[in-house]
Each structure stands twice: as structure tokens, then as C-alpha cells.
Amino acid sequence: MYKRQVYERNKPGDTFGWGVVFSDQTMENLIANDPVSAQKMNDELIHWDYIDTIVNGEVDRSGGHGFIGIGRKRLLQILYDRARELGVELNFESEVNTENLPAQFPDADVIVAADGLNSRVRNNDLEHFKCDIDMRPNRFVWLGTKQTFDDAFTFIWEKTEHGWLWVHAYQFDKDTSTFIVECDAQTYENFGFDSMSHEESAETCRKVFEQYLGGHELLTNSAHIRGSAWINFPRVLCHNWIKDNVVLIGDAAHTAHFSIGSGTKLALEDAISLADKLDTVADKKQALLDYQNEREIDALRLQSSARNSLTWFEQLDRYLKFDFKQFSYSLLTRSQRVSHENLRLRDQKWLEGMEKWFAENATGKKFDKPIAPMFVPYKLRAMELVNRMVVSPMSMYSAENGLPDDWHFVHYGALAKGGAALVYTEMTDVSADARITPGCTGLWNDEQQHAWARIVGFAHKHTNAKMAIQLGHAGPKGSTKKPWDSKMSDEPLDEGGWEIVSASAVPFADYSDTPKEISRDEMQSVLEDFVSATKRADAAGFDMVK
């Protein structure tokens, strides 16, 4: 039987923040690992289904999101009680010398560093843990309120004379909610939050969001020894979680932005995995390696979504200019974990309303039923596209002397009949010396122009597709083999090549031919080639030139 000891620098119940948000999947993991503590949590969980988006008093609600929450202090108490039942020794208000843990605990088989986003264990040896810490620019503060927001996770934006403030609010017990206030660096400075006490900050925020608080105050937990004043979010990513018999878990190893509510989830699932490996793998060193290998991918996946979310909040100036409906849609899909069709599963009525709004807003026409945004027509200057699908340029390297032939006729004809509204050609070169390979298409003579006109004419006669041509010049990448004739990318031709030019005499790759530094007269010649090719593209009937 192992002796298990926990050393906590804080008093029992001291915690950073107010409530914790879980997903149903996290609870399933907890139930499978320890049904006793999971049941106690489950008995006290607050459930909600909606997300409310509020901007300057305007409200948009969507459903089907399925959140659950619990108070951090209550969660800790449940875990304390269960740990004691299982014989774990809990030591509170116990500072540990993190500079040499193995010397301080010489008999320990494993030392678990769960000391959070400001982990001293990690910070003492950032190089060993291969740790990147990226301090993000926005500021936020953890507050609480007796206003319950009892049926929705609520996002609120208010524009003030000092800039935008916004809130992430959610209920975590029967009469209390977390109330996180966030802003950008300039708004933080404009308000003077840096010179305010925690209580003064809370009162300032209360006045801004008074209409949503139902007469309740904003609460602080300033008795906590670390405080919870305005801070920047540190994005922590460790590529190594192990040093000797010391192992990182939770925020010490990786952080996920609070806007997707997954920090505690990651920590709990780390702990479950670590306990399982220590229990089932005889060699402790291998157990730690297996733990990191199992958890690292999941953590990276969630961190990627969290990065998308935090970046969205950092770029709000862009999104707050959107129509309110579009803003709400952007908010819901910001992490890229929730797709358009996933929103349909969550709240079909809401999404269909959004689709109908989008189609009418984009076209100025009324629609009896919703249309998926992909199939809404699009107008670019005088060019009208029947939908928003585009076939991007793809070099095929199948021409001779730059001439598109029957192969290209079939290829582009099939793409045009495939349903995309806009079909791009491959990069088509403006002169023979502008080609990447001998197989590249061109548009520098009449024969090529007529061949392209045949392809464009077919697309216009038999499909709704518009045709766009991509004109280009290879520069230092020119005079190279076709991809299937070489083991290397862009390998120079052995014979039959041509002189290549570039802005400077620097090879494209270390094995490439050295280009000639282009002269002013040659620049003018290249410019004239582009002008000539553009005129030929227009004469061939192309709808668009890139």
C-alpha cells in the first residue's frame, strides 16, 4: 500500500475563481474512475442548455449546448472528503521547496506537481520541461454574483466611454454565478483598473453591467492569498512533462483558455490517466511516459480549440462590427469545435433562422425557407456566382509548349459540371520563360488563347460555372522538372532549361539553379507579358483574372 500525501500551500477552500464548468463526457470519465465522488458531484451539479449572447442589451438565445457546473469550493470539499476516506494525508498551508523536490522527498516513488498555471516546479526548469509560455494581451478578473443566470451560459458586451467590457457568466450552485469580466489592454488602461483595489474594480464593473445583475453586487474572493485581481492569461505548453520522478499535471503542464471552460476538465482527466498508469504499469518511469503519451494529444487538441477561442476574443474589434446575428454565429463557432451542421443538431430552429437571415441579407431577396450559406448566391462586382463554392488553382503539369489540350478540356469541363460556382485554372504563365516546368500551361500566343476559349465556352454553355484564370511567373522556381520526374520538389531540368530571373541572385532552394538578378528593362518586359496575357484572357472569355 502506497503512502499518499498532498501538500497544499493554501488554506482549505481557498481557490482562484468561483465555479467550474464540465461536459457530460467529463462526468462519464469521473463516474468510471470513482463513482463515489462523482455521485456526490452529480447530486449538486447545475445544468443549463442555452447560450445567451447580449450586446448592448440586445439578446440572442440558442439551445442544445448542454453545460454543467459546480462551485470550486464545493468541488474541492468533495475531493478532500473522498481523499481522506481513501487514506490520503492532506497537508494545508504547507510550503514546499520546489527547487529540489527529490531531495526534499527522498523516499517518494512519484512526485506529482499540480501547482497550477504559475507552477514553481515547472518555472524552475523551463528548459527541461521544454515549456513555451505565451502571455496573452487581454485582461480579465474573476468575480461572483448572487444573480443566477439560471438557464443560460451568458455572454454580455457593453460599450463604454473607455472601450468594450464583456462578461462570461454562468451559474454554479443554486444561488451563485461566476462573473468573469474581460477587456483588451487599452480599455484596461483607459479605466485605470491597474490603480484600483479589487473591490473598486468590482464596483466599477457592477455599474457597467447593472442592468443584468438584478440588484445584486459583484463579489470578490480577495481573502485568497493569491488574490484574483486583473490578470493576463498565460498560454502554457510543455513538450516534456517529466523530470526524474517528478511529473506535471493540469495547468502546470498545459493551459486552456477559460472561454471554453476546460482547465479543470484537463486536470481531472490527467489525474485519472496518471493514476491508471501508476496502477497498471509496473515500471514507474514507463508509467509516467505512458501517461504523457496518452494525455498529450488530447491536451493539444483542446488547447488548439482554446487558442482559437481566445484569439477570437482578442480580435473583437473585427467581430463587433458584424450584424448581431452574424456576431452570435461567430461566437458559437469560434473554437472550431462546433461546426455549422453541429449547430443544426443543437438547435435547428435557431440555425435555420440564421440561414434565412444570411441569405436575405446577402442577396436582398426574401426566402420562404432557409438556405445553407454555401448555396447562397454571391456577387463580385459584375460577376454573379450561383453559390459560394470555388475550385482553387491546382497545377497539373500536363501541357506541351504551354498549350492546354483535350486533357485540359476534359479536366476543366468536369470541374465546371461539378457544381462549383467558380473554377480557377492552374497557374497559367505569361511567357515561356515564366513557366515552372515544361508541363505548365501558358497564355502568350494565339493558339493557347483559342484553346482556353474552347474550354471557357464549354463551361459557359453547359454549366452555371464562371471561369477564372490565375496568371503567374515562376521567378527563381522556374525551369524545373515535373513532380513525377524527380525525387525532389522543384529540381532543375537536366537539359532543355531556360534562363530564370528573380529580384536577386538567390536560389529558390540550395539545390536550385541561381537566377539572374532582373534588370529594369526585364521588369518592364515581364509587366508587358502580364498585360498581354490579361488581354488574351479577356478575349478568351474568362470571367475573372487573378
Predicted segments, located by residue:
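Conserved mid-domain beta->alpha element of the FAD-binding
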Residues: 112-113, 143, 227-308, 312
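C-terminal helical "tail/cap" subdomain of flavin- and related membrane-associated enzymes
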Residues: 276-366
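Conserved N-terminal helical subregion
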Residues: 24-142, 351-358
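N-terminal capping/small domains of soluble enzymes
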Residues: 363-474, 481-483, 526, 534
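Non-globular sequence segments
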Residues: 457, 472-540
